[in-house]
Amino acid sequence: MLKSLFAVALAAVIAAPLLAPPAEAHGPTRKKVTETIEINAPPEKVWAAIGNFQDMSWHPAVVKQEGQNGSAIDATRRLTLPNDGTIDEVLVKYDAAKMSYSYRITAVDVKVLPVTNYSSTITVLPGADGKTSMVEWRGAFYRGYPNNDPPAELNDDAAIAAVTGVYKGGLEALKKKIESGS
């Protein structure tokens, strides 16, 4: 009897790893969004509108901006949104010759923008015909909730939708501003 009980226990120990469900990955993965828009203006004109890190007046979601150190590396800015939410950012790379700069968010409430560990680059490129510009805005980030089973407003889809909305809204407003001459 003891021998058969031992055999059953040994079989259970051997079979357990084979019957256990596979371990699942946990936590969020880094997401990326890239949006581009063609603007009927030369790159220099477009860069003149967006090349100053301290000036986000072209973006309709920004009602106020304040910052320090212009467009120097480690310059900071605080963007205030219509709902009084704020986003604090720091400039990490700036290349006027390549018409590009990169920045990252240092502080934001996930209720304002449902992301964490956000970094972004905005670049102005010549259009195919030489008379237009392509503006590319790309970012990488994690969702606003770092653990498994995030609430809907802080999941991957919410983060991607929010960043996509920021980029599309900004790029469309930039195009309208430049092409209308305002």
Summary of predicted features, one role per range:
Residues 53-89, 96-98:
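Short beta-edge strand/loop motif at the mouth of beta-sheet-based domains
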Residues 14-22:
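C-terminal segment of classical bacterial N-terminal signal peptides
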